Amino acid sequence: MAAASPTAHDVYLFHEGSLFKSYQLFGSHYRELNGKSGYEFCVWAPHASEVRVAGDFNSWSGEEHVMHRVNDNGIWTLFIPGIGEKERYKYEIVTNNGEIRLKADPYAIYSEVRPNTASLTYDLEGYSWQDQKWQKKQKAKTLYEKPVFIYELHLGSWKKHSDGRHYSYKELSQTLIPYIKKHGFTHIELLPVYEHPYDRSWGYQGTGYYSPTSRFGPPHDLMKFVDECHQQNIGVILDWVPGHFCKDAHGLYMFDGEPLYEYKEERDRENWLWGTANFDLGKPEVHSFLISNALYWAEFYHIDGFRVDAVANILYWPNQDERHTNPYAVDFLKKLNQTMREAYPHVMMIAEDSTEWPQVTGAVEEGGLGFHYKWNMGWMNDVLKYMETPPEERRHCHQLISFSLLYAFSEHFVLPFSHDEVVYGKKSLLNKMPGDYWQKFAQYRLLLGYMTVHPGKKLIFMGSEFAQFDEWKDTEQLDWFLDSFPMHQKASVFTQDLLRFYQKSKILYEHDHRAQSFEWIDVHNDEQSIFSFIRYGQKHGEALVIICNFTPVVYHQYDVGVPFFTQYIEVLNSDSETYGGSGQINKKPLSAKKGALHHKPCYITMTIPPYGISILRAVKKRGEIKR
């Protein structure tokens, strides 16, 4: 990442809001100048009367390293010879009223381990990537046609050493990656890993946007972690927060003594809900900073996607009783997504949005925001509300399951059971389920199975794969001791089999964003709380028949309408004894019988498992499948 002194063109683009590689200009960069090696520093501080560089190399007295002002809009630079790598530094900002503030570099690419807050000089060059096969594979197929089953995790609490130390990026490469591979997840999604001062903010209140947190090691170790994920066919998505930032004194807040990265007006600037400051998305220089940041992570860390946090907080002005659209934010999101699509068309842009904003995943040129995917918060809330309802009462809220298919194809959706649903007293997925010990596990398997066959990409939070009983405890590691309990072992086996089935079943992902991929068989059976539907493949005769029973009642000799006059074999049943179920499965192929049922030309007779999902595949029998 070779730096250069600011050119007039760079300066123009930065202030216009389109210097999308601003990290090549700002920050600290190794240079050789006039036969001397050192680091060049560049910072934006338009309200400062003077800016200096302070660090270990001058005993933290910046008076001998005063920066030069490049233009009237506040870009400052300085080359300091003799500085090596991993030198600590900050900017000594002299405000208009003479106050001196020590600030970390907004474009720092490496930082001290908290609670220390200095930036570190660092050279990002030199890592030799080995993920060429992965990159070629990503570019070869349309993004929407790929299987996506995401494992969301918090690096600080996935696993810890016995003395409480975090696992490093290197150690996670050796432990996390094989674990993800074993379970069959296609992607991991990391809660924010850019630098943040407070552990319990989980990274969502950050300030070092270009600096991977040093809690887990240096930047090159994170590169290697991502590289090794790719070599194992695992994509890496980052949680990314372009809406607000923490207000710690060393960070972006009031950077040069006045609002700079944040809005000028207090009611717009202060995020009273989270105690943070909102980015001024009407300021072109902030556009350059944030859009460059997304491009930076894609370029230098080969990141495969961004889950954009709290989009509702971005789209609407904060701290108001009624929602009012922020036009600057709308323009920013469109610009961000359009830029990313042009530069990295295979990198997913995912909106965490709980609003009814139209066309979140629509093309920018057609009036949309330009995201690839949107979290389906409505589906998540409805399904969890339904599952937490006692089974005998579920017939009264049948619509909580059926309603999602009225809008499932209006956007490109991700179905999320995220960290937000298993923390702060909300209970774990398993413990949300009503009933006794066995019933909780049965409904947990049904829930994951139903999510897997519902249109949309998938996401679960760490611990859900083995049915952790306790909700997420962010200061502790996951309850790995549960692996010694048979039902948790079997839950893990179920998750692995379910995800392997998903990855092998193109029916479930190749065109799950198209309405013709789904058809109800019987959506009106509220008395028995049984739902049946079909997932169609792209070729004639490709079909999965799916039956979900949300009560503990077993049904034998149950008739289900089917689309083709052929045989059906059960390819997955959550009630299998292998998974801890009661064994109410369909061992033999089921032959379709003549006679219309459920508006289908024929039907099969089968066993319906308690609290279970049964997935049947249509198979050819003596020639072509007949409809």
Curated annotation (Swiss-Prot):
Active site positions: 309 (nucleophile), 352 (proton donor)
Q: Which UniProt keywords apply?
A: Carbohydrate metabolism, Glycogen biosynthesis, Glycogen metabolism, Glycosyltransferase, Transferase
The record's catalysed reaction(s) read: Transfers a segment of a (1->4)-alpha-D-glucan chain to a primary hydroxy group in a similar glucan chain
One MF annotation (Gene Ontology) recorded for this entry = hydrolase activity, hydrolyzing O-glycosyl compounds
Question: Which residues constitute the signal peptide according to the record?
Answer: none
What CDD domains has UniProt attached to this entry? AmyAc_Glg_BE, E_set_GBE_prok_N
The stated induction of this gene product is: Expressed exclusively on media containing carbon sources that allow efficient sporulation.
By its UniProt entry, which InterPro entries does this protein fall under?
A-amylase/branching_C, Branching_enzy, GlgB, GlgB_N_E_set_prok, Glyco_hydro_13_cat_dom, Glyco_hydro_13_N, Glyco_hydro_b, Glycoside_hydrolase_SF
Keyword check for Transferase:
yes
A GO biological-process term: glycogen biosynthetic process
One GO cellular component, as annotated: cytosol
Q: Which domain of life is it from?
A: Bacteria
Known pathway = Glycan biosynthesis; glycogen biosynthesis
**Pfam families named among the record's database cross-references:** Alpha-amylase, Alpha-amylase_C, CBM_48
EC? 2.4.1.18
Q: How does it assemble?
A: Monomer.
- What family is reported? Belongs to the glycosyl hydrolase 13 family. GlgB subfamily.
Functional description taken from the UniProt entry:
Catalyzes the formation of the alpha-1,6-glucosidic linkages in glycogen by scission of a 1,4-alpha-linked oligosaccharide from growing alpha-1,4-glucan chains and the subsequent attachment of the oligosaccharide to the alpha-1,6 position.
Q: Which PANTHER family does the UniProt record give?
A: 1,4-ALPHA-GLUCAN-BRANCHING ENZYME
Q: How is this protein named in the record?
A: 1,4-alpha-glucan branching enzyme GlgB
User: What species is this protein from?
Assistant: Bacillus subtilis (strain 168)
